[in-house]
Amino acid sequence: MAFSVQMPALGESVTEGTVTRWLKQEGDTVELDEPLVEVSTDKVDTEIPSPAAGVLTKIIAQEDDTVEVGGELAVIGDAKDAGEAAAPAPEKVPAAQPESKPAPEPPPVQPTSGAPAGGDAKPVLMPELGESVTEGTVIRWLKKIGDSVQVDEPLVEVSTDKVDTEIPSPVAGVLVSISADEDATVPVGGELARIGVAADIGAAPAPKPAPKPVPEPAPTPKAEPAPSPPAAQPAGAAEGAPYVTPLVRKLASENNIDLAGVTGTGVGGRIRKQDVLAAAEQKKRAKAPAPAAQAAAAPAPKAPPAPAPALAHLRGTTQKASRIRQITANKTRESLQATAQLTQTHEVDMTKIVGLRARAKAAFAEREGVNLTFLPFFAKAVIDALKIHPNINASYNEDTKEITYYDAEHLGFAVDTEQGLLSPVIHDAGDLSLAGLARAIADIAARARSGNLKPDELSGGTFTITNIGSQGALFDTPILVPPQAAMLGTGAIVKRPRVVVDASGNESIGVRSVCYLPLTYDHRLIDGADAGRFLTTIKHRLEEGAFEADLGL
C-alpha cells in the first residue's frame, strides 16, 4: 500500500512551504516518523516525518519547489511495492542474526506502537498553551521510544510564539511511538506521541530490540553513526556526549557560546535552551567589569558595551531570523497595517517622585524584597488614568464596528530578553497597590528573561507600558499591540533647567528632573484630544507625587 506524503499545515496563516532539503533519496528505506524532508515557511523551518514505514518510491516536489498546504511531496511504498528497492531492507535484519531471538521481535514492536494506537495506547496531544496559541514546536523529547513514564512526568519540551514549556505524560506506561519529531510544528490537538499503558505492554523487554530500527540508542555501536548527522557539531565529542537540538545549537551560535563548555541541566546531561541563555548571561557579566573599572562613577556606560561581544561575530554574515524575531516582524507590520497609529508626547516634572523614591527605596527594598524603581509609579498613574478615561482602555472591532470598554486594567510591560522583545501581562493590575505593582513587575520581568512565563501571561493585555528610558532614550514612537488601543513609553528621567513658579506666582529657573511620556494611540478609536486628556491626568498624578501613603512615609 502506498502512502502520500503531503505538506502539512505549519501555522495558522501558513498556506505553503518550500522544500529546502531531502533527507532521503528514492529507494531509501524509512521508518515511521523518521525525518524525511526539510521544509521552510514564512514562520518556521522544520522537518516533515514519514507517515509510514516503507521505501521512498517517488519524490514529487524537488528542492526549492514551493508546495501548497495539502500538496503532495512524495510517495512511500511498502517493501513489496518497492520491488528491488525493498531488497536491502531485509538484509539489515539478518545482519543482527547473532542474536537470533531478538531479531524477530522488532517487527512486532512496530505494530505494537501502531496497534495500541488504535485502542489501547493513549495519545499525547498538543495542549492549548495560551489564549491565542494555535500551534507548538517540539524542542526536545525527554523520553525515547521504549522508555517507561509516570503520570505527569515531563515527556517533551515544546515552544510556542509565547512560551516554552514541558508537556507531561497523561498516563503511566511506555512510550510506544513518537508522532512529532524535534523541530516539528504541531497544531493544538495534534498528536505528539502515544503511551501504551503498562498492562497493555506485556512485552516489557521489547524496548531493547525495538530501538534497532530506530537508530537512537547507544547499545549498538554501528547504529550510532546514523543519529550523528543531526547533531554534526557535537559529534566529535565521543559516544557519551549528550544530544544537542538544532534550536540549542542555533542559539549558541547566535550568542557565540562554545557548547563544549556548557553544563547541561536536562535529562542525561543534555544541554537545554536555558543553559545556553545562562551561559550567555554569565559571559556578558564577565565582560561588563572592564568598562566599569575605567568609569566606576558612571553606571550608565555599563549597558552599551555588553551587547557588543555577543553580536560582534554577526558582522559580514547572513543569519536565519530567530522565531521571536520573525514573530515580532510579522506582528509589528500587521499592527501598522491594521490600525491608524500616531503618537503624542507630554513632558512631566518627576522631581517629587525622584525625591520620594530616594527617601523610601532602602526601607522599601527591605520590607518588600524588591528594589523600588520608577516603573511602579508610572504604572500606578496609568491605572488611575485608565479608570478615569475608559475609552483608552478599550478596543475597536473593524468587522463588527463595535467598541469594547474593559472593566479591568490588564497591563502589559515590554521586556528586553536574550531571545527578543516580549510583552508579559499583569492581569488585574488595577487591584494592586504601588508595592504590589513593584513586586509583580519585578517577578514577571525576571521570569520573562529566564523563559519561565506561563502562556496566559503573554496575552490578554488591555494597555502596555514600554520603558524606553532604560537605555537612555528620551522619547520614541511605540507600536501598538492589537487589539489594544494605546501604548505608553516612559523616557529617561534627566535633569534640565526649567521655569519654576512658586505659590505667589513668582518665576525662577531651577534644576528639575523631567521625562517625556510618548503615547501611541489608535486614531480609529481615540482622538488627539482624548489622548491629551489621558496624558494630562497621568502628568498631574506624577507631578503631584502623592504616594507617601503607598510608601509608608
Curated annotation (Swiss-Prot):
Inhibited by rhodanine compounds. Some of them almost exclusively kill non-replicating mycobacteria in synergy with products of host immunity, such as nitric oxide and hypoxia, and are effective on bacteria within macrophages. One of its GO terms (cellular component) is cytosol. It holds the Pfam family Biotin_lipoyl. Residues 243-280 form the Peripheral subunit-binding (PSBD) domain. The modification N-acetylalanine is found at residue 2. One of its GO terms (biological process) is tricarboxylic acid cycle. Residues 2-77, 121-196 form the Lipoyl-binding domain. Keywords: Acetylation, Acyltransferase, Antioxidant, Lipoyl, Repeat, Transferase, Virulence. SUPFAM superfamilies: CoA-dependent acyltransferases, Peripheral subunit-binding domain of 2-oxo acid dehydrogenase complex, Single hybrid motif. It is an enzyme of class 2 (transferase). The modification N6-lipoyllysine is found at residues 43, 162. One of its GO terms (molecular function) is lipoic acid binding. Optimum pH is 8.0 for PDH complex activity. Half-maximal activity is observed at pH 7.0 and pH 9.0. Activity is abolished at pH < 5. It catalyses: N(6)-[(R)-dihydrolipoyl]-L-lysyl-[protein] + acetyl-CoA = N(6)-[(R)-S(8)-acetyldihydrolipoyl]-L-lysyl-[protein] + CoA. Is the only lipoylated protein in strain H37Rv grown on a standard rich medium. However, in a DlaT-deficient strain, another protein, BkdC, becomes lipoylated. This is Dihydrolipoyllysine-residue acetyltransferase component of pyruvate dehydrogenase complex. It comes from Mycobacterium tuberculosis (strain ATCC 25618 / H37Rv).
